[in-house]
Amino acid sequence: MLRLLVVASLIGLSSAACGFPNGTDTKLNWWQGATTAKVTFTTVDAVDASGNSVYPISLTQPLTVKTHLDNEQGVFSAPNLRMDIKLYEYGGLVGCSWSSVPTFGLLSNMDACTQGVPCPVAVGDQDLTMVIDFTQFASIISLLSNDSPYQIELKLSDKTSNTYVTIMAQARCLTK
């Protein structure tokens, strides 16, 4: 029992010692990741119902993400637009770095059009507001540390054109 307590304490201390990377204590960091589709995101922001920026991000309620993008690939629509989400936590026994959070496939190969992406996604320069509802994954979210830095990788894949676009975001997240 004492060994378990010592290990748990070390994990907590190593996570706390790392702090918030890349300014995530005060702001959302995002970038466009690996992409084969002709889609370019120029803004990504977490917003409330009035369209005002919100930070930190709460994963205990639906997350509204306002984006601006230029889609030169083609129209994306159901059932061919798929979404995969990967989560990463910062810190832990491996030191101050990002490590994958196991989701056991629950966040893989989801129908993007029923999971918050307004479909069809038209061709052209446009604003696109997505609502990602993490509450349906409470079994995963409840295991995450509260008020901690997390990295979210959101990948949208189009099965018609066999292309994909990835958005990466690092944020201070609330899980309680």
Tell what function each PLM region has.
Residues M1-A16:
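Cleavable N-terminal signal peptides of Sec/SRP-targeted secreted and luminal proteins
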Residues L13-V117, V121-K176:
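N-terminal onset of structured domains
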